[in-house]
Amino acid sequence: MNYSIGKILPTDTASLSAIDQLLIDEGIRRDRHLDYTCAMFDDEMNIIATGSCYNNTLRCLTVSHEHQGEGLMNQIVTHLINVQMEQGNNHLFLYTKYCSAKFFSSLGFQEIVRIPNQIVFMENKRNGFQHYLTKLQSAIKKTQSLSPKIAALVMNCNPFTLGHQYLIEKAAAENDLVHLFMLSEDCSFFPYEVRKKLIQAGIAHLSNVVLHDSDSYIISQATFPSYFQKDEDAVIQSHIAIDLQIFTRIAATLGIQRRYVGDEPFSHVTQIYNQAMQQKLPEHGIECIIVNRKTIDGRAISASNVRQAIQQKNWRLIKSLVPQSTFDFLMSDKATPIIKKIQQSKEVTHY
């Protein structure tokens, strides 16, 4: 049979409702983060298969159990890959159930890491992650040989605050070399290029800190796919397990012995993440150092506090929370669209 595949618009509530039911029937749910969705229709215009994208990832792929074995998933994936290629995304990623990894391998996807009996993280570029590790290593080869104490931090910096600066300065003072990994995904209020420039300005005085892009290998909890997880805590645990496997391979490549993280007693996600790092990282010879956050007037400095202050137009408070370089940017015309977006948003804090 010849089935048709078409794009589903966000306004097509009937089709989206049918997709939701199909996903539920097959044991998954629609992910919170999608920017393209397609569906396959039978001769009576019933939706029998679906798939979606978010940035350069494939998500929410499923075929009705009544039509499995007909090669429909292959057609859905091919359609999504073509959509991604048209958008200039040649390096694609997906997270799939453990039992489905073999199928995606047959379509050219390579395993990066896996959580046994749960999730497999895959990419369509052969040895892509190994090439990323090689790129990291070549960038610091000369410096690393002279650095017996090597540490790392992973940050989003949305935007870069005095809290971030304090944590980086502490790591820089206590180690010979510090690798700072900045989340590359562009899904924050402050775009990737802006965050990178603010970080560079904020660490310019630290000669032993090397800034790296995370590429698509390290992503935030906010955009980790949740569609085949039973609840939010399961999503968090899966993200942590994948993320720490990625990080420990990076650490082994770069000789990283310590990872610095900021404490955040009011964040459920951060508490779970920090506990997992304290347990898992030492198994790989990496010390997890949790640092009490820098405070002002007894309150911890965080990027979410800065965003809230921007929303409230409290510039005096903002000036006390960020380095001068960040504040200067916020006062510039280039920041106007970002500030407007934050001020118009209902929610500017993280989970």
Residue ranges and their predicted role:
Residues 67, 71-79, 163:
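Conserved acetyl-CoA pyrophosphate-binding loop and the N-cap/start of the following alpha-helix
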Residues 34, 54, 115-116:
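Structural motif
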Residues 39, 45-62:
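Conserved beta-strand in the GNAT
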Residues 1-30, 41, 46:
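Short amphipathic alpha-helix that is part of the acyltransferase structural core
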Residues 35, 58, 148:
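Short coil/loop residues immediately preceding or within conserved phosphate-binding loops
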Residues 84-97:
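Conserved GNAT acetyl-CoA-binding A-motif
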Residues 40-44, 175-178:
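A generic structural motif
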Residues 96, 101-109, 114-351:
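Nucleotidyltransferase catalytic core that binds NTPs
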